[in-house]
Swiss-Prot record:
Tetramer of two alpha and two beta chains. The keyword Amino-acid biosynthesis applies. The keyword Translocase does not apply. Pathway: Amino-acid biosynthesis; L-tryptophan biosynthesis; L-tryptophan from chorismate: step 5/5. The gene is trpB. This is Tryptophan synthase beta chain. The modification N6-(pyridoxal phosphate)lysine is found at K99. It comes from Brucella melitensis biotype 2 (strain ATCC 23457). Gene3D superfamilies: 3.40.50.1100.
Length: 406
């Protein structure tokens, strides 16, 4: 979690102010600054504490089910007729996605800090479920803010959160999506700074959140790197992950950043196309600005107002991205590309039929990029795709879009 890096490494950020180049930082209300600094201090202490690491490792292994498998997607690979595609199976984790990795780390931090109330925001519902899960495990009350339109899209996950004892608060402001849920969670935090821990679900927000979320999620890439060396005897040629806020992607990417031979591709939500405003491709079509406490690429109009955006996937319709991704884009280390709704839907069905695995719509965006890339590569080439979550939560959405009455 805190190994030394070379000065010319891509792993040197963030600096003491939480900056990755010109991105990141701590743009928060004055009332929150002491809490942010307290969190930073608690995290610095925790990540150097062998007891903290041991407890997190034990929970990850025996509660979450790590390590997740690296699976050769033979059916999909043969169907496409190019590179060998491996799936990093984060869908097999407890709660069904990568979100549990971060939630376990942060709930242990909250405990260390003496916080007695957990708040979280969620889009696809997976982070809300994971937050409610760890809160239940440690006997803490949990409030989850969910955009009203996402409540409609993610009914099974809303029920799971309630079942786990969380209070679900729908947010109807704006378009009722992830951005609006995050706004409400920040308002709650400002009001209840004494006893409340804000368990952010993505690699965005004010420093130290982008760093600590990345560190807790880097277990994905650390495992995948070791697993591919064991299975193929070499590093992959390409790694691919979907990017909303960017936590599953930075978790896969970070351990590979200094491997120059590995091409890294982040996949954004292209929605209905980049020509209008019905997409969430902030790095393909946005520009730098400040949102939710950090400077990063954002979707905004000419006056700097944040646009709502659209994606078929509730977990990708965030109008910004984690600041480290913005820096990796500008530094040229990672390529970020958009995938359209219909391409993701096609990949969702193709993966299900060729592999017997129903992926989350977020993950389907990454698979859609693999569908484009793999046939252009030789059969001796190797690709890892992060299967960030399972698709049970999306079956109703997909059914509706395909004209099936569920």
């Amino acid at each position: 979690m805190n190994k030394p890096v070379a000065p010319n490494s891509y792993k040197t950020g963030p600096d003491e102010e939480g900056m990755f180049g010109i991105f990141g930082g701590r743009f928060v209300a004055e009332t929150l600054m002491p809490l942010i600094l307290e969190l930073q201090q608690a995290y610095e202490t925790a990540k150097n504490d062998p007891e903290f690491k041991a407890e997190l490792n034990a929970l990850s292994t025996f509660y979450a089910g790590r390590p997740s498998k690296l699976y050769y997607a033979e059916g999909l690979s043969k169907h496409l007729g190019g590179a060998k595609i491996y799936f990093k199976r984060e869908d097999l984790n407890h709660t069904g996605s990568h979100k549990i990795n971060n939630c376990l780390g942060q709930i242990l931090l909250a405990k260390r800090m003496g916080k007695t109330r957990i708040i979280a925001e969620t889009g696809a519902g997976q982070h809300g479920v994971a937050s409610a899960t760890v809160a239940a495990r440690f006997g803490l009350p949990c409030i989850v803010y969910v955009g009203a339109s996402d409540v409609e899209r993610q009914k099974p996950n809303v029920f799971r959160m309630k079942l786990l004892g969380a209070e679900v608060k729908p947010v109807s402001a704006g378009n009722g999506t992830l951005k609006d849920a995050m706004n409400e969670a920040l308002r709650d935090w400002v009001t209840n700074v004494e006893d409340t821990y804000y368990l952010i679900g993505t690699a965005a927000g004010p420093h130290p959140y982008p760093e600590l979320v990345r560190d807790f999620q880097s277990v994905i890439g650390t495992e995948a790197r070791q697993q591919i060396l064991e299975q193929e005897g070499r590093l992959p040629d390409v790694i691919v992950a979907a990017v909303g806020g960017g936590s599953n992607a930075i978790g896969l990417f970070h351990p590979f950043l200094d491997d120059a031979s590995v091409k890294i591709v982040g996949v954004e939500a292209g929605g209905r196309g980049l020509e209008g405003e019905e997409h969430c491709a902030s790095m393909s079509a946005g520009r730098p600005g400040v949102l939710h406490g950090n400077r990063t690429y954002l979707l905004q109009n000419a006056d700097g107002q944040i646009l709502e955006g659209h994606s078929v996937s509730a977990g990708l319709d965030y109008p910004g991205v984690g600041p480290e991704h913005s820096w990796l884009k500008d530094s040229g280390r990672v390529d970020y590309v958009p995938i359209l709704d219909n391409e993701a839907l096609d990949a969702f069905q193709l993966c299900t039929r060729t592999e017997g695995i129903i992926p989350a719509l977020e993950s389907a965006h990454a698979i859609a990029q693999a569908v484009k890339m793999a046939p252009t590569m030789g059969k001796d080439k190797v690709m890892i795709v992060n299967l960030s979550g399972r698709g049970d939560k999306d079956v109703h959405t997909v059914g509706k879009l395909l004209g099936m009455d569920i």
